[in-house]
Each structure stands twice: as structure tokens, then as C-alpha cells.
Amino acid sequence: MSVVGIDLGFQSCYVAVARAGGIETIANEYSDRCTPACISFGPKNRSIGAAAKSQVISNAKNTVQGFKRFHGRAFSDPFVEAEKSNLAYDVVQLPTGLTGIKVTYMEEERNFTTEQVTAMLLSKLKETAESVLKKPVVDCVVSVPCFYTDAERRSVMDATQIAGLNCLRLMNETTAVALAYGIYKQDLPALEEKPRNVVFVDMGHSAYQVSVCAFNRGKLKVLATAFDTTLGGRKFDEVLVNHFCEEFGKKYKLDIKSKIRALLRLSQECEKLKKLMSANASDLPLSIECFMNDVDVSGTMNRGKFLEMCNDLLARVEPPLRSVLEQTKLKKEDIYAVEIVGGATRIPAVKEKISKFFGKELSTTLNADEAVTRGCALQCAILSPAFKVREFSITDVVPYPISLRWNSPAEEGSSDCEVFSKNHAAPFSKVLTFYRKEPFTLEAYYSSPQDLPYPDPAIAQFSVQKVTPQSDGSSSKVKVKVRVNVHGIFSVSSASLVEVHKSEENEEPMETDQNAKEEEKMQVDQEEPHVEEQQQQTPAENKAESEEMETSQAGSKDKKMDQPPQAKKAKVKTSTVDLPIENQLLWQIDREMLNLYIENEGKMIMQDKLEKERNDAKNAVEEYVYEMRDKLSGEYEKFVSEDDRNSFTLKLEDTENWLYEDGEDQPKQVYVDKLAELKNLGQPIKIRFQESEERPKLFEELGKQIQQYMKIISSFKNKEDQYDHLDAADMTKVEKSTNEAMEWMNNKLNLQNKQSLTMDPVVKSKEIEAKIKELTSICSPIISKPKPKVEPPKEEQKNAEQNGPVDGQGDNPGPQAAEQGTDAAVPSDSDKKLPEMDID
């Protein structure tokens, strides 16, 4: 079973796998561990990753990048409106109201959802992992920013399904970094001791995230998170781009922003310049040849000037740092370490700001680029039954407070209640109790819209169906289980109605006989963090079982709280009935549409595969043309007649011209047939060359064999001791076979020497190999027959043993005899060691 962690970044992606030796970040087909988050659409296929990155400028309108933040967002979203101006491709409104991406693919205009585009990237990363692991990849853990809302998280989950992946967990990027940091630490405080507080700062290409985590041995608890969703490396790039657009506009009279290709080229150069300035404080040049209207442009920049231009951005570094300390009520002295990751943290001014705020040196023990994917792979290994991993519990937080709203007839309006506060532990479940006579609807929403980086605070509506009053007309008790799962997604996971069955005896009043106003109140059962933490550590296969356990425990606790003392005296029976729940999720893709996207992705993967095979077949023809044309005037020259060489060379030239004209775009089979046609002419020449190389070596080997056997035959005839045990008839057979082989070899050599090199050889290498094998199989068993061993006679030893007792020496041995007996009874040291030596 494969264990894979995927860091799905804004600009680039990483894939890590868990193996017996630990966690390994794997490389793609370009031997690069970083895969650009880029997809280019062409007339025949899609290019994904590094291949697409090279087409950003040449195929700008159909090359998609920077789409990560479109997940779960409507086309009218202010964020989408702001992003559109920076994109080379078209962003359109889909029939559902969501943001779509418009490109030309397979010679026709196509609109793709953000989920489809992300699924394409995930399919590529999946293929990369499978090529390294040599087995299918299904289970994975995918990273998302900690500030993602429900709609965005569900959108990413849909993308994983389209790509054919089973996402065991959507993991917050800062939590993944914390796991990668903590699981290997051997010096963490014990569970009963004060935890170690570590701040993790992650500034990537598009966003800035901060979290505070408390570590104990085998335990990680996220205390709080803070973020700036738009502060990242690209903002610093934009400062440089805007500066040079203005400078080149004045200096060269160019309107750079009117030409998207020119703007993309400038963006690439500015990103390189920014990275150079991180390591160099001196003036650095920026030069671009034939930049726009055949004009070469150049400029300079240094770190000091760049930092002055970025003052507004640098001022945004501190607020999230201050926010996490305020949320956790920690002092700077309570922080053990500040660990930084993400590409933008390499900017010296950013590091200086963070270090100055905490008043301590920053820690860089983690790989700034790969920490997230390594943490995801570790989480996948923890969830997978295929790996035995050190026990390590992970408790995350809810980034925004979540509330429920419902209609309350008794109060003639709506009521609401906050079920999960900000920084509440997650994953987590709660059981709520309602008293209702009819179906009702719960509306989930984020209760602090001002803190939300998303325009719509609504999460979903959950309608609890088939609610009926009790037999006496009173309100029924309805238990609703709400939870934030391991993906950070809120849901009403179940609802049940408690039916009361009364006996015929007079009973004391039940809890259900409350006044109408009290019936409308909601009761929240006590929380169970321990159950959730246990569920967190169980393998993915046991999730359902854990949830059942959690529900039953919550139910029993609820009964204890709700059941009044009078009920013990009354003879009352209760039963629960599961109620159906209808979900209306914000921007959720329906199952039918999701299946269609899965089918379309499969078709596109197959089209890419067919196009690759077609290109490989075409390249094979081109490669053969160049190879044979070169060798015909080189090493193959002696093995082909002048007329044949001229005609074959002409054929190769015609094929080359055909490849760039009529044969430029042909089906795969046409190229396969063309290659076979060329090989019919070229293969005989190649074989003649190979035979001329191998034949002398094999004849030499055969000659050595014959000489060896002739020497042995001569030694046998001279009756040398070494061979005097061999049978004469067998040696006659050896002599006959050797003479026949010599005659065959001489005959073939003479014929071959008379044969022209431009003609097929008289004898082929395989025939010589067969003759060597035949001669060896006949002669070798005979001449290698071992000499029979001659054992010394044992009669004298037996007589010596019998004579001793007969002479009477056995009863009264003298001193000498006694000594001899002792020697015989106790063997010497050398005698003792012999068996060991023999064994060795």
C-alpha cells in the first residue's frame, strides 16, 4: 500500500512518500523535486508541470497557473475580480455561478472548473509517485492553507476524487510543518509536564500563515493560527514589476502592461532578481533582449532600494505574529523556538522582522520548501495500517467560529447558538438536543464574517426530515450530531428521534411534558476531546467504527444529562429512530456532475497517453534517419555497396523531408510502418557490421577450445598420470569431436575470407556459438572426470587394537603404556580444532 503526501502549492507542488527508510521527497521526470503548478492546453494534448511552465509565454492564453485560490469561489467574488487582471488566460462564470477557466483544447473552446484543473495537476503528481513506487497510488494526504473555509475545502476534496485519489485527510499546511518538526524530536517534555510552545511561520508565494503549537512527548496540539491571505512572495515580485514597468515606460516609451507576454517575461525576470537580491546586497542588473517591439531593455536594482519600496508589505509581517500571542495569551518568553518555512522567508527583511518581534534567533531546522509535503506523508503513514509509526496524536483547531441558526416558533423568530468557537479543538463532535413536532432546518454559518477571507459567511443548510410529535401530541426529543471532521469540514452527521413508549400505569410527568417555550430550547451535550483524539490516531479503515463508538458514548452521556429523577420511578421505554438529513451545501458539486468530471479526466489522460505514443513513434523515425545517415558514411561504409548506399541515403533524405512536410502530423501507425520500411533496408547492413565485430572473437574462442582439447588428447596418448584414469573409448570420442570442429572452423574461415563484406556472411555468430556449445557439451564431461580416490588399508590398525588386550597390557599397563593411553584419551589441541577448520 502506497503512502503519499502532497503539497499543493500556489506556484509549485511537492510529493513525498513514506518508505521503510523514512520519508523521501521524490523527483519528477526532469529529476526535479519541485513540480510547477501549471497546465498548458494544446491542440492534441495537455502539458502539466515543468513541460507546461516552458509554454507560459509561447502559449500564454491556454497556460493556466495561479488557480489554487479559485476553489469554492463564485465568479462575482471580489478576490476573483482582483485576480483576473493579473492572468493571461480567461476566467469565466460557469452556469453554477462558480469561477471557470476558459481555454482552447483539442481545437475547441472549453470551460473547466477549478476542481477539474486541480485534478489534472493531482493526476500528474499521482503519476510521478507511481513511477517511483512502481505501484498504484490511491491513499494520500493533501495540504491546504489553514484559512480555507468549508466551501474551499470541499472543492479540494472533489478535485482529489476526480483525480482518482482517496484523500485520508486535508491537512493544514502549518499543522503539517509542525508534525514534520515534532515527530522526530526525542527531547520533548513528558505528558504531565509543561508543553513546549513553538511558533511556525510559513510565507509562501501567495499567503502568509502563522501557528503556535504545544508539544509534549507523542502529542501535538495547535493552540492558534493567524494569517494574511494575500501577503506572499508574489507581492514582492509585483513591486519590482510595477517599478520596471514605470521605468521602462519612461525610458523606452513602452506600455508593457498592454502586452501580456511582455508582462509575463518581466515577471519571470523580476522573480529571478528578487532571489538574487536575497543573497547579494550590491547593484544587480536586469536585462531583457527583444523585450517588446524589438527593443532591448535594461535596468538595475539593489536590496536597499527594494526594501524601501516594500515597506508597506513588511509592515504586514508583524500583525499575525502579534495575533497568535494574543489569542493564546502567551508571552514572547514562553516561546521555545520560531521555525520558518516557505520560499518568501528567504527574504532577509522578512526574517529580520520576525526575529526582531520575538527577540530571538530564528530556527531553520526544516527544509523550507519540502516541510509541508513531508508532514503530509507522515500523517498518511500514521493513518495507514501498512506502516508502524511512533504514536503521535494531532489536535488541530477550527479557524473561524461556527454557529447554527434555526426557526423557533415559540419565540416567533429564529434562534442561534455558537457550536464551535474560534480555535476550538478539531476534529470534534457535539450532540445537540432539540424538541420538535415537525421537520426543521439548521443553518450553519461563520459567526465572525469580518474575520473571514471569503465574502459569504454561509456554510450549509441541513434539513432534519420525518420529525413527528409523540403519541400524546407533545414535542419529540431530537438528537443532532454536528462535527468538524479531519478535513476541517463542518457537517450535521446524524439525527435521531427519541420515541417514548408509556406503560398503562399512571406515570409521573416526563421531560417531554414541558411548556412550549422550553421545548424550543437547544441542549448541547458535553464535549469529548479524548474520543476524537483516539479517532485521530486510528487507521483510515477504522474511521467509521470510531465514529460509531463516539456517537454511542455521546448518546449515553446525553441520556444521563437529560433524564430527570422522576423517570426512574416511571415505567417508560424509549427507542431511537434515525432521521434522514437533506444537505444544501454552498457551491457543492452534485454527484452526477462529479462522475462526469471523473469520466472526462480519464478521457483526457488517455488522449495524453496516445499523443505521447504518437510523438514517440515519430521521434523514433527521425532518430533512425539521423543515426543511419551518419553511420552509412562511417562504420557501416564497408558493409554496403556504393549503389545500395546511394539509394538508401536518398531514401533517408526523402523520409526526413516527409517528416517536416506531409508526415508532420500523422497517426502513430503511419510512423510505425515508415520505421519498419527503413529498417528493412538498414537492418541487413547493421547485421553485417555486428557480425564482423563478433565473428573474429567467437572464432578465436573456438580455436582456444580446440587447442585445449588437443593438448589433453596428446597428454592422454603419452599416458600422463593426470589423465590415465580416463577411458580410451571416451577419449576417442573427444578426439573425433575436436577434429570435426577444427575442420568445420577452417572450412568456414576459408569461405568467409573469400566473401565480400557487402554480402551477407557465410557463417553467423549464432552458428559459431552453437558449435562451441556442442564441442564443450561432448568433451568437458569426459576430460573433467575426477580420478578415483585410493583409501589406505585398515587391516594393520585393526590388528594393533586386538593385540593390546591379548598381551595382557590392558589389565596392568606400565608407565609408558599409561602415558600412551592418556595421549589417546585426551586429544591434542590441534586435533580438537580440525573439525572446525573442516567445517569452515
UniProtKB/Swiss-Prot annotation:
Bias (Basic and acidic residues) ranges: 514-533, 788-799, 829-840
Keyword annotations: Acetylation, ATP-binding, Cytoplasm, Methylation, Nucleotide-binding, Phosphoprotein, Stress response
Gene Ontology biological process terms, A to Z: chaperone-mediated protein complex assembly; protein insertion into mitochondrial outer membrane
Region ranges (Disordered): 500-575, 783-840
InterPro entries membership: ATPase_NBD (IPR043129), Heat_shock_70_CS (IPR018181), HSP70_C_sf (IPR029048), HSP70_peptide-bd_sf (IPR029047), Hsp_70_fam (IPR013126), HSPA4_NBD (IPR042052)
Family: Belongs to the heat shock protein 70 family.
Taxonomic classification: Eukaryota, Metazoa, Chordata, Craniata, Vertebrata
Subunit note: Interacts with TJP1/ZO-1.
Localization in the cell: Cytoplasm
UniProt source species: Pongo abelii
Single GO molecular function: ATP-dependent protein folding chaperone
Residue numbers bearing the Phosphoserine modification: S76, S393, S415, S546, S647, S756
Modified residues (N6-methyllysine): K773
Modified-residue entries (N6-acetyllysine), positions: K53, K430, K679
Positions bearing Phosphothreonine: T538
Residues modified to Phosphotyrosine: Y89, Y336, Y660
Name of protein: Heat shock 70 kDa protein 4
Keyword ATP-binding found: yes
Gene3D superfamilies (UniProt xref): 1.20.1270.10, 3.30.30.30, 3.30.420.40, Actin, Chain A, domain 4 (3.90.640.10), Substrate Binding Domain Of DNAk, Chain A, domain 1 (2.60.34.10)
Primary location: cytoplasm
GO CC annotation: cytosol; extracellular exosome; mitochondrion; nucleus
